[in-house]
Amino acid sequence: MTETSANKPENTQAHEGRDYSVLERQFNVLRDKLRNVDRQLAAATQNNTKMTTTLQSAKAEILRLKSALEKDGQAPYSFATLVQINPRRTPGQAVSTLSAADQASSATGLAVTEESVDIAYQGRKMRVGLSPLVNIASLSPGQEVLLNESLTVIAGLGFERTGEIVSVKELIGTDRALVTGRADEERVVKLSGALMSQKIRVGDALSADSRSGYALEKVPRSEVENLILEEVPDISYHDIGGLGPQIEQIRDAVELPFLHPDLYREHGLKAPKGILLYGPPGCGKTLIAKAVANSLAARAAERNGLKETKSFFLNIKGPELLDKYVGETERKIRLIFARAREKASDGSAVVVFFDEMDSLFRTRGTGVSSDVETTIVPQLLSEIDGVERLDNVIVIGASNREDMIDPAILRPGRLDVKVKIQRPDAEAAADIFAKYVTVDLPLHQDDLLAHGNSAQATVDAMIQRTVEAMYSTDKSNEYLEVTYANGDSEMLYFKDFNSGAVIQNVVDRAKKYAIKDLLTTGDKGIRVDHMLRAVADEFREHEDMPNTTNPDDWARISDKKGERITYIRTIIQGKAGQEPGKTLETSLNTGQYL
């Protein structure tokens, strides 16, 4: 009994140990199952996400295909041109109560209870309704509109960008124009809403739609616009050197009649219609013409007490006016003067400048291969003193062959004032040099020290030395020897062929030499040596330039008139380190000057 009681605790402990092992094994099994369930749940979640994405993509694709099928079944939209707008108007409403745009485009005398528009569609003119989503105020005549299958306007589009090019011949009221098209066919077109807000002039090129009868767009005519420069030049008389007497003569002829018209009327005087500036090339004819326009604007502003008065300078590129088609050059001349009259209609001064006038208006009957001058010259004459007056318009012509211009243009009453722009003498050359060589330029320190560090004294001395070298008559400056028909001969020097353009080129050369010295030696500033070297190089460069094939023509262009020249000997001076000077003989040849 005692032994059995002693073994009982041992059996209980063994039994409990077995139960713990069983529970531990069951726990491990359940934990493994839980892990498997978590993995299965994660895989299911991932598959569910993929399934959701796939379903959404399929739904979007189904909607896209459905929309495409619906569009494929829609009726096509049509395009039409808007001809007229008919706003809503009651029977008792007067036309005057409508806006200006509605009065111009609405059907007068009819009661319009619903908003509608007239369109040009497939060769027919139709009146159609508008969608409630279309604002009638946003539409304008000539505009393209979009029509649905029931021919209702559902949208307003832009203006057609293509069409037939026509030229405006005459304006009819404010909304129509008489135009010429192909083969000079004339027709009346309406101006579209886009053109109604622009200023249309005679001669303008328009793009027109022949189906609707509307002019849609203004097209720049580059072949005409490029010939005319309407900018007001910023060149004044102070920018021109060596032409004091000529400038005074021009100011008396141009500015006095424009600034004091009452005095001229009181004395029975008329303002000159034109000025001819003639002389050798490069002496300032174009500069003077630009200064005239600038001065007229400044004087008019002073007279009227204004800060600024507009003036216009129409610079006509003479040779580019010529056209191979008969009548085109005359048309361009008419357009130029129509533009000038338009600009001058408000009292502004307009200068019409014909450069190289001899290329356009040659003496009639002198043409070798053509006779275009027989119609171009009369066209200019009719514009200058024709039926239409040229008030506030001044014609200025420039030429270095005034002998080739038709005498009818040069007579009094047309080009009244004739101003000869001569080659500059030594005093005029110094004045021109002073316009380009100023105290603002960097001057070399050695030259400044030689004149007491005075920039003005240095510049004056530099100009004086340069002019003396340019106008010396020693052997180094001999240029040409001419022989006249009477047997006399004359030596011409470099100074006899000097011009303002040559002087400017000399200064530019000197500046370039100063820059090269600064880059190579580090010495900064312009020196007298640079100016003298520039004069010598300019002279040497022009030794082979004079074309003396025809001595008479060469003499006219070079401003050597008088006794007929029969023989020219070109003198070539040797450069430093090269062979000494020599002469080239030129025999008489009747060829043209080219």
UniProtKB/Swiss-Prot annotation:
Keyword Nucleotide-binding: yes
PROSITE patterns to which the protein is assigned, alphabetical: AAA
Disordered: annotated segments: 1-20
Keyword terms: ATP-binding, Chaperone, Coiled coil, Nucleotide-binding, Proteasome
Coiled-coil zones: 18-71
InterPro entries: AAA+_ATPase, AAA_ATPase_domain, ATPase_AAA_core, ATPase_AAA_CS, NA-bd_OB-fold, P-loop_NTPase, Prot_ATP_ID_OB_2nd, Prot_ATP_ID_OB_N
Any single GO CC term annotated in Swiss-Prot or TrEMBL for this entry: proteasome complex
Gene3D superfamilies on file: 1.10.8.60, Nucleic acid-binding proteins, P-loop containing nucleotide triphosphate hydrolases
UniProt: ATP binding residues: G282, C283, G284, K285, T286, L287
Domain of life: Bacteria
GO process terms (BP): modification-dependent protein catabolic process; proteasomal protein catabolic process
Bias-annotated ranges (Polar residues): 1-12
Gene Ontology molecular function: ATP binding; ATP hydrolysis activity
Residue ranges of the region described as Docks into pockets in the proteasome alpha-ring: 593-594
Pathway connected to this protein: Protein degradation; proteasomal Pup-dependent pathway
Keyword Amino-acid biosynthesis set for record: no
Subunit and partners: Homohexamer. Assembles into a hexameric ring structure that caps the 20S proteasome core. Strongly interacts with the prokaryotic ubiquitin-like protein Pup through a hydrophobic interface; the interacting region of ARC lies in its N-terminal coiled-coil domain. There is one Pup binding site per ARC hexamer ring. Upon ATP-binding, the C-terminus of ARC interacts with the alpha-rings of the proteasome core, possibly by binding to the intersubunit pockets.
Written domain comment of the UniProt record: Consists of three main regions, an N-terminal coiled-coil domain that binds to protein Pup and functions as a docking station, an interdomain involved in ARC hexamerization, and a C-terminal ATPase domain of the AAA type.
Described function: ATPase which is responsible for recognizing, binding, unfolding and translocation of pupylated proteins into the bacterial 20S proteasome core particle. May be essential for opening the gate of the 20S proteasome via an interaction with its C-terminus, thereby allowing substrate entry and access to the site of proteolysis. Thus, the C-termini of the proteasomal ATPase may function like a 'key in a lock' to induce gate opening and therefore regulate proteolysis.
Similarity comment: Belongs to the AAA ATPase family.
Protein name, as recorded: Proteasome-associated ATPase
Organism, scientific name: Renibacterium salmoninarum (strain ATCC 33209 / DSM 20767 / JCM 11484 / NBRC 15589 / NCIMB 2235)
